[in-house]
Amino acid sequence: MNAQTARLSRPARRLETIITRQPDLIEAAQKLRYRVFSEEYGSDLGATVPGIDADEFDRYCDHLIVTDQNTGELVATTRVLHHSKAMEAGGFYSEGEFELSSLYRLPGAVAELGRTCVHPDYRNGATISLLWASLAEYLVSRDVDYLIGCASIGMSDGGLKAWRIARYLQREFLAGEEYRVTPLRALPHLTHTVSEERPVDVPALIKAYMRLGARVCGEPCWDPDFRCADLLVVLDVNNLASRYSRHFMRNQAQ
């Protein structure tokens, strides 16, 4: 371990999480991101280097990665952009999709979560729980009060699924007026009514956001690079779901 990398938790089963700014680990995360996002959204992501999902925000972020210690493979990743680093970067990533003035008025430190993905073979409760527990530990250690980020939904069916999920989340998990944002590129509305009676298949990562206590901040945005719909979500870090807070506090005591 070097000065660019800090271990956050003990291995859970065969998995380990670390927070890093180490270039080779960030590149491995960028390769996983490309694989997952290009397959799920059917887009080359506007990549300038084949097989790598990278942007100008990566160098300002802390990157949380999950590694399988049996194989050495990186199996999950997300990145966190703290408010102070966002100012150096010219703003948050999500400011390219939403008008965020309401969130800048929040009383406390804000950080942005982004590029969250999990290897298809590791999309289980253990991996996701470890990812969120490590994230909770990081946020508390950095005195972050609010977490924002984009929750993405694929558009392979032309938008019906995205609108059904968006409407469901707005009904069940809509944030208060003080958290509302406006999309810069609003997702085009369907020409027919979205049924509210049929079951809604919410993506696993978005379910995890809601379990953490996240809330949806308004209407969805269209992301042309990823060919997906994005919803801006906000999480009051003080309201982290109890099972995640207990998890990281237990690790601290060990």
Predicted stretch roles:
Residues M1-R10, Q254:
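Basic/polar N-terminal segments that are highly enriched at the extreme N-terminus
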Residues A6-H82:
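Short amphipathic alpha-helix that is part of the acyltransferase structural core
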Residues D53-D55, K161-I165, L231-L235:
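Short low-complexity, flexible loop/linker segments enriched in glycine and/or proline
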Residues C61, C228-L232:
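Short hydrophobic/aromatic beta-strand or adjacent loop that forms the aromatic wall/cage
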Residues E73, A126, A241-S245:
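Short, conserved charged micro-motifs
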Residues H83-R215, P220-C228, L240:
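Acyl-donor binding region in acyl/amide transferases
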Residues L232-Q254:
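Long, continuous compositionally biased terminal/linker segments
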